[in-house]
């Protein structure tokens, strides 16, 4: 097992792992230890009351955070005709069909999000082995396969996050940067939790959101008291 650095030991010593912190206090703790030479991301882990082994209980979707994520996504759009012009006008970084597919096959993937109109899936479908492992394959469940590509581009550019539970039923995503104000981080977290509650599977029983923890890129997790949200 790797030894803890002095910084990580100090962080762990400053966080009570048995306590669920009031949200403003939790954010203050994160900011206190966010001392990396770069602006750290603020990540969240949400433990859900689901059985991830059952396909009808898996949670997947997307939501736009009110204050964004602190970074602007590069967006590639597979579409043609009027939709291509609309995508460009909405701010898409790359737009095309077979020509864009050829770039992807060559490993030229300078983008963070891939959007496709339904008629373009015949082209995108051939890229599954390349885009799939990177989590870039367009999917109607998260709004990246849509006839309204312009709206999807605007959402991606304005701070939309995608989420999907892992094999343990936990959602991992980002809610901003360490230099966001406490209110911005709180409102982003509230928006995410509201989206998750809305996406609750009808077959999930009992407490749905069981635990919420936030952390910075280089920091320890801090449990959040949900009553403070």
Swiss-Prot record:
HAMAP family: Ribosomal_uL1_B. Belongs to the universal ribosomal protein uL1 family. Keywords: Repressor, Ribonucleoprotein, Ribosomal protein, RNA-binding, rRNA-binding, Translation regulation, tRNA-binding. GO terms for biological process: regulation of translation; translation. Binds directly to 23S rRNA. The L1 stalk is quite mobile in the ribosome, and is involved in E site tRNA release. Protein L1 is also a translational repressor protein, it controls the translation of the L11 operon by binding to its mRNA. Part of the 50S ribosomal subunit. Pfam families: Ribosomal_L1. One of its GO terms (molecular function) is structural constituent of ribosome. CDD domains: Ribosomal_L1. PROSITE patterns: RIBOSOMAL_L1 (PS01199). One of its GO terms (cellular component) is cytosolic large ribosomal subunit. It comes from the Bacteria. The keyword rRNA-binding applies. It comes from Glaesserella parasuis serovar 5 (strain SH0165). This is Large ribosomal subunit protein uL1.
């Amino acid at each position: 097992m790797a030894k803890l650095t002095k910084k990580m030991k100090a962080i762990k010593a400053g966080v009570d792992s048995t306590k669920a912190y009031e949200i403003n206090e939790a954010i203050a703790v994160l900011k206190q230890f966010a001392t990396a030479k770069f602006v750290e991301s603020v990540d969240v882990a949400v433990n859900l009351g689901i059985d991830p082994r059952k396909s009808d209980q898996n949670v997947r979707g997307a939501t736009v955070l009110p204050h964004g994520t602190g970074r602007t996504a590069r967006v590639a759009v597979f579409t043609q005709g009027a939709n291509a012009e609309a995508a460009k006008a909405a701010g898409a970084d790359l737009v095309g069909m077979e020509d864009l597919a050829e770039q992807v096959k060559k490993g030229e993937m300078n983008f963070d999000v891939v959007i496709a109109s339904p008629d373009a899936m015949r082209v995108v479908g051939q890229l599954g082995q390349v885009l799939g492992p990177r989590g870039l394959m367009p999917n109607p469940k998260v709004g990246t396969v849509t006839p309204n590509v312009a709206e999807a581009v605007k959402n991606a550019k304005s701070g939309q996050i995608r989420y999907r539970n892992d094999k343990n039923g936990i959602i991992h995503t980002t809610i901003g940067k360490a230099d966001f104000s406490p209110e911005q981080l709180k409102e982003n977290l509230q928006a995410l939790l509201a989206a998750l509650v809305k996406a609750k599977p009808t077959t999930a029983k009992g407490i749905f959101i069981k635990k919420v923890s936030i952390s910075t890129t280089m920091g320890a997790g801090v449990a959040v008291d949900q009553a403070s949200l």
